[in-house]
From Swiss-Prot:
Organism name: Xenopus laevis (African clawed frog)
Region (Disordered) location: 155-176, 331-393, 488-508, 604-656, 671-743, 774-811, 938-968, 1087-1115
Coiled coil: none
Basic and acidic residues bias (residue ranges): 719-743, 941-952
Residue interval(s) of motif SH3-binding: 991-997
GO cellular component terms given for this protein: cytoplasm; dendritic spine; postsynaptic density; postsynaptic membrane
Gene (name only): shank2
InterPro entries: PDZ, PDZ_6, PDZ_sf, SAM, SAM/pointed_sf, SHANK
Domain SAM: from-to ranges: 1229-1292
Official protein name in the record: SH3 and multiple ankyrin repeat domains protein 2
Compositional bias per record (Low complexity), positions renumbered to this chain: 355-365, 492-504, 953-968
The family this protein is said to belong to: Belongs to the SHANK family.
Residue ranges with Polar residues bias: 375-384, 604-623, 1098-1115
Keywords from the UniProt entry: Cytoplasm, SH3-binding, Synapse
PROSITE patterns: PDZ (PS50106), SAM_DOMAIN (PS50105)
Length: 1292
């Protein structure tokens, strides 16, 4: 039966070709219907003419394919009861076409089969849409009962075959012309059938044609999508019947391609220009080897329909979704929503909607023409796709879509060949970004010229997705500063966006580019549109960096950046692995290393040390060799670089030369050597110091190790990660380091460069500034890894902590140096730390939410200064601290000066440095250095805030000081580490410029003193700002305020242990004095809640140390003065990151939840001022220390705050204001109070809206995000600040 029918079909198709081309549709229609009436149809008996064969088939298809047939038939919303089945036309719905080798074909279904039952439901009289829905509902399983009608061939059949076949279905029946009602069409069809039957001479092909005419061709939306199995176009001759009827090939995945004859004949019949369906189908999927021309011919019904007069929009609706395409079809229409594929070809698996080109073959495969005609045009021009054939852009777009899409399939979008071949085009395309409507695949369109068929997916109006080239991929994207390591912090746009980029970039790439030279163009070339975007971002970063550099803060803190920026050398010291050695880049680094990093033997303990020491000597070589014996353990890792044998920085074990860490070290060493030569001393050692700070990508850290392993050549490996990995691998080395860490002070320099949120610039500062710096770098390296690797980190942290306790013992001031270390990592919970500090992107993060002080967590690695303070710090005998203090006391100020050789190698010197930092104010010459520090610190803060060099996310600046963490440990407050949400931690102690370090250490000392006092104090004491301790210089006080912001690491718990503070008498005395003072202050605070904090700033209590202020202060020497939050002797829980920023402070308010932390958050202080529960977490030391009598500090804070980029947590930290609202419960506030409160938060810009909306204190607690947005607080940072402040208020 099949054979005769096929023959008939073939003959009829041939005949059609001969006969019908000259006929118009109307002529054919007239012929078809002129002789017959419905009555005649009904009366006519074709039983003799037709052989009826019924069969039931079960179709099982895959999700990504269709059933392989195109259903066609009368369209009606309800069953057409008037329809009387006849042998010749037993049902309304029939198979217009069946894909060869498709599911239906294999089940025995053939073109012309009438569908009588679907899933055991009778559909003889059911309309097309309902049947299609039934089929769809069946899912991948379909049971069909079909009737195959075969005409008996009479002797005269042969002759009849040559007779003109009945006209193709009337235009009325044409899907495109849906003008006629179903009934009228049915009638006509019936007439046709009747006539056919009457004259048995009508061939089977004629009957089939009539059937087709009878049935309104309707695309089987879902069924088609179900994807009739796509198959190569059948020769026109093969499908005469199909040719007669407009074939609705399923556009769905399988995309049956209507036989060319079918489509052509169908189009001819319809009088529709044949537009190749945009999505020819093939079982194999979108990749059809079919030439474009073929595809065009195969255009889906929808394409044809539009020609008929249906709009492309309509066609889209008409066309079944392209879901079935193997590539994008799997994605439902969502593909339309999917952004266009990147300019670069996407990976071979085409994205669901790689581009408009991928627009589903929907009725009108919407090319760009449909959605983006402009784009389509561009595409059309770019790719001489047959689209030209389509007159309208939509058609062209569709054609292009086919090609592009197919190309995308054929050539993986990622395929380099395609991309390269089209690079210029894409480049042009990118250059024409204004035209971005163009599909990035327009290039693909050219590929399309290759004849690849790409099913058109629905075009997405949204901008095309451009494949984001890896930041690492484009050197230009990479910070001009070569940062072999991928240190890209989330806010890669951090103050030194470049650095963040550079960090991600390979060092070599960076070498070619200077800091300021991000080459967006190149990246564009590489990535296309995305590259362009990145380039723009890079440019912005560059601008930012320039501004930062120009700003005073940059001069003080960003010198390194400047140096780096100018240096064309690929190395970006900041971005280099934490290892200073990574910076071994330049003499600058060497100078830095010498002065700022201690070449302490600790090198072994820290990768940094190794690198640093080598830096000092021969940045690369010396680094490897210089590390002294114990340090050589780490140094071997680095210095061994030359020999190929590396010591694990943490464990001190020899690394397998092939291990990722060893490779990374080797690469770093090589880079260092290279860098050393090119940039021996690009600028002052100070600048080198700035460069020296390592950008630690805490976020990337975990991956960095792998990356480093993968990229042995990347100097840019994050040392921090390396150290982290080192720490993780070997605890033994960690132990060594721990011992060393004790001596080591890690300063995190403010580097405006480190604007990138993710980057932390870690300067390790030993007791001796210069050496300290080196050691600190090492430790920084050590510590950061511990943060990264919890277990290894703990050990280093313990070590660090041990050192910290020593410092604490030496004197509270000693803590300042250490503070950075402590602040960065909590000794006990390295893991937590990484998440403590809000990622840079979230400048305003609620500390309360993030920090539950019940269990202080270390700041997130991003924000951690990669300082691990060993929990053991608390274990350090107070005597040692006292000794350190004494030593420091004796030479308290040498540390400020950077003497590369100053006992930097000796742990003792480090201790001394720490001690001097920690020394009580009485012990230190804090005033002198303090002044310097304050100036430089403030300057840094200001410039930083103003230019936001470091802190694009400056708002999230938090002063993280180990001081707070170690507060109870003996006031061994590490220098305050200002950690920015950016993830940048800046230690005031070690300013990029030596003067700052001097000043900062002093500040630290002063702070340490206060911190110690705070340590002694209980939370209640902290709640109240201490009366300004006379010893603290005003500038120091601000630093303390910042300290308040510092987030306390778990060290706080240790501090608790230390709290007993078996400190040398000086420290003990100081602590006792401070405790008494704090107690008094607490009482005073209770009495005058707003006084202490308010007076300094008038904005926020110093204790609040608004983030901006604190951050600034932190950046400035004040950072060093990070307030140490004392943990009540009973409180083991370290306060985590209280110094963070106002944000952190706010969190501290949240911290209050965990009373254990002694530190009172600024908000808490406010509360205290308003006699609030002292049990609330103590305000940051800065709060306590900032005395009402310290207006200067307040000024500093005010300046800092003003400079802070945006209302930062510091702002949020509710400065205790003299305004009435500060004394009233929030629910008692009036509109004016709310407005004043907003002003105090530096959010006065929203004052009017709040006033206009009559927002009073009763409304504030209930304000939701949507409410704030309605009130005009559209900036996330502002909302967060408000929410934070509200939390503080509510917690008071």
């Amino acid at each position: 039966m099949v054979t005769p029918r096929l023959q008939t079909m073939a003959e009829s198709s041939k005949f059609k070709k001969k006969v019908h081309f000259g006929e118009t549709r109307s002529d054919r229609t007239k012929k078809l219907f002129r002789h017959y009436t419905v009555g005649s149809y009904d009366s006519f008996d074709a039983s003799s003419d037709c052989i009826i064969e019924e069969k039931t088939v079960v179709l099982q298809k895959k999700d990504n394919e269709g059933f392989g047939f195109v259903l066609r038939g009368a369209k009606a919303d309800t069953p057409i009861e008037e329809f009387n089945p006849t042998p010749a036309f037993p049902a309304l719905q029939y198979l217009e076409s069946v894909d060869e080798d498709g599911v239906a074909w294999q089940a025995g279904l053939r073109t012309g089969d009438f569908l009588t039952e679907v899933n055991n439901e009778n559909v003889v009289k059911v309309g097309h849409r309902q049947v299609v829905n039934m089929i769809r509902h069946g899912g991948n399983h379909l049971v069909l009962k079909v009737v195959t009608v075969t005409r008996n061939l009479d002797p005269d059949d042969t002759a009849r075959k040559k007779a003109p076949p009945p006209p193709k279905r009337a235009p009325t029946t044409a899907l495109s012309l849906r003008s006629k009602s179903m009934t009228s069409e049915l009638e006509e069809l019936a007439v046709d059938i009747a006539s056919v039957r009457r004259r048995k001479d009508v061939q089977v092909s004629d009957v089939e044609c009539l059937k087709r005419r009878i049935v309104i061709r309707v695309a089987l939306n879902k069924s088609e999508e179900s994807g009739p199995i796509s198959k190569p176009l059948r020769p026109l001759d093969n499908t005469p019947v199909n040719s007669r009827v407009a074939t609705v090939k399923q556009r769905p995945t399988s995309r049956c391609f209507p036989a060319a004859s079918d489509t052509n004949s169908m189009y001819d019949r319809q009088g529709i220009a044949v537009i190749p369906p945009t999505t020819p189908g093939s079982h194999q999927g979108p990749f059809l080897g079919i030439p474009r021309g073929t595809m065009r011919r195969q255009k889906s019904i929808d394409s044809r329909i539009p020609l008929s007069g249906i709009t492309e929009e309509e066609r889209q609706f008409l066309a079944p979704p392209m879901l079935k395409f193997t590539r994008s079809l799997s994605m439902p229409d969502a593909s339309e929503d999917i952004p266009p594929p990147p300019a670069t070809l996407p990976p071979s698996p085409p994205p669901p909607s790689p581009s408009s080109f991928n627009s589903p073959k929907s009725p009108a495969p919407r090319g760009y023409g449909t959605i983006k005609p402009a784009f389509t045009q561009n595409s059309g021009t770019k790719s001489p796709s047959p689209a030209v054939r389509s007159d309208n852009v939509g058609t062209i777009a569709r054609d292009k879509s086919m090609y592009f899409r197919h190309e995308a399939n054929r050539f993986s979008l990622d395929s380099e060949e395609l991309y390269n071949s089209n690079m210029s085009t894409q480049q042009n395309f990118i250059n024409k970004r204004s035209k971005m409507p163009e599909n990035p695949y327009s290039e693909v369109g050219r590929l399309g010229n290759k004849g690849v068929y790409v099913p058109a997916k629905p075009v997405r109006r949204k901008g095309m997705l451009v494949k984001q080239s890896n930041v690492e991929d484009s050197p230009e994207k990479t910070c001009s500063i070569p940062i072999p390591t991928i240190i890209i912090k989330e806010p890669s746009t951090s103050s030194s966006g470049k650095s963040s980029q550079g960090s991600s970039m390979e060092t070599d790439l960076q070498i070619s580019e200077q800091v300021g030279q991000l080459r967006p163009d190149e990246s564009l070339n590489v990535s296309g549109p995305f590259a362009a975007a990145i380039a723009g971002a890079v440019r912005d970063r560059e601008k930012r960096l320039e501004a930062r550099r120009n700003s005073p803060a940059f001069l003080s803190t960003d010198l390194g950046d400047e140096c780096v920026g100018p240096k064309p050398s690929p190395r970006l010291q900041h971005s280099k692995s934490i290892d200073d050695g990574m910076f071994c880049s330049e003499e600058k680094a060497k100078h830095f290393m010498a002065p700022s990093s201690l070449i302490i033997n600790r090198g072994s303990s820290n990768a940094f040390t190794n690198n640093d020491s080598s830096h000092q000597g021969d940045v690369s070589n010396a680094r490897m060799s210089k590390i002294k014996g114990p340090e050589n353990n780490a140094a071997p890792a680095k210095s061994t670089n030359a020999s190929g044998n590396y010591m694990h920085p943490v464990t001190g074990k020899l690394l397998d030369p092939n291990s990722p860490l060893a490779l990374a070290l080797a690469a770093r060493d090589r880079a260092l050597k290279e860098q050393n030569q090119p940039s021996p001393s690009p600028t002052d050692p100070e600048k080198a110091d700035l460069n020296k700070p390592l950008f630690i990508d805490t976020k990337l850290r975990s991956g960095m190790e792998t990356i480093n392993a993968n990229r042995p050549n990347m100097r840019g490996m994050l040392k921090r990660q390396e150290t982290e990995s080192k720490h993780e691998p070997d605890s033994s080395k960690e132990e060594k380091r721990q011992g060393e860490k004790k001596n080591m002070l890690i300063n995190i320099m403010d580097t405006s460069q480190q604007k990138t949120a993710g980057l932390l610039m870690v300067h390790t500062v030993d007791t001796t500034k210069a050496d300290n710096v080196l050691t600190e770098s090492e430790e920084a390296e050590k510590d950061p890894p511990p943060e990264n690797s919890n277990s290894p980190v703990s050990e280093p942290r313990e070590e660090l902590e041990n050192s910290i306790p020593k410092a604490s013992e030496c004197g509270t001031p000693a803590a300042p140096h250490i503070k950075a270390i402590v602040s960065v990592c909590s000794v006990e919970e390295p893991v937590i730390l990484p998440f403590r500090i809000p990622p840079p992107p979230f400048a305003s993060v609620d500390v309360d939410e993030d920090f539950v002080f019940t269990e202080p967590l270390p700041p997130p690695l991003e924000f951690a200064n990669s300082f691990d303070i060993p929990e053991d710090a608390s274990q350090i005998p107070p005597a040692s601290l006292a000794d350190l203090l004494i030593q420091r006391k004796n030479r308290a100020f040498p540390p400020p000066s950077f003497n590369p050789n100053i006992a930097s190698n000796s742990i003792e010197s480090k201790r001394l440095a720490a001690l001097s930092n920690c020394l009580p104010t009485s012990f230190m010459q804090h005033p002198e250095s303090f002044d310097n520090v304050t100036d430089s610190g403030i300057e840094e803060v200001d410039s930083r805030s103003g230019s936001d060099h470091h802190l694009e996310t400056t708002s999230t600046i938090s002063t993280v000081s180990s001081i707070s963490t170690l507060s109870s440990e003996g006031g061994e407050n590490l220098d305050t580490c200002t950690v920015y949400a950016d993830g940048q931690a800046f230690l005031v102690d070690k300013p990029p410029v030596p003067p700052k370090p001097k000043v900062k250490p002093i500040i630290n000392k002063s702070n340490a003193l206060y911190k110690d006092a705070v340590l002694e104090e209980n939370l209640d004491n902290f709640a109240v700002p201490l009366p300004a301790p006379p010893p603290l210089p005003l500038s120091i006080q601000p630093s303390m305020t910042k300290a308040g912001q510092q987030r306390t690491s778990k060290l706080w718990g240790d501090n608790t242990e230390v709290k007993s503070l078996v400190m040398p008498s000086p420290k003990a005395n100081v602590i006792s004095e401070l405790n008494s003072i704090l107690q008094q202050m607490n009482r005073e605070k209770a009495t005058k809640t707003g006084e202490g904090l308010d007076s300094p700033t008038g904005m926020k209590t110093a204790s609040l140390s608004t983030r901006g202020t604190d951050a600034l202060s932190t950046v400035s020497g004040n950072r060093n003065a990070a307030v140490t939050f004392t943990i009540r002797p009973g409180a083991n829980q370290p306060i985590s990151l209280q110094n963070r920023t106002p944000e952190f402070d706010s969190r501290v308010t949240g911290m209050r939840r965990a009373p254990s932390p002694v530190v009172v958050s600024p908000a808490e202080i406010i509360r205290d001022i308003k006699p609030g529960p002292l049990s609330a977490p103590p305000a940051s030391m800065s709060d306590v220390f900032i005395l009402p009598s310290q207006p200067p500090s307040g000024d500093m804070f005010g300046m800092s705050m003003g400079r802070s980029r945006s209302p930062s947590p510091s702002i949020l930290q509710q400065p205790i204001s003299n305004k009435p609202f500060s004394a009233k419960p929030i629910h008692m506030w009036t509109k004016q109070d709310v407005a004043e409160w907003l002003e105090s938060l530096h959010l006065g810009e929203h004052r009017e809206m709040f006033m206009d909306n009559e927002i009073d204190g009763t409304h504030l607690p209930n304000l939701q995000k949507e409410d704030l947005i309605d009130l005009g607080v559209t900036r996330v940072g502002h909302r967060m600040n408000i929410e934070r402040a509200l939390k503080q208020l509510l917690d008071r």
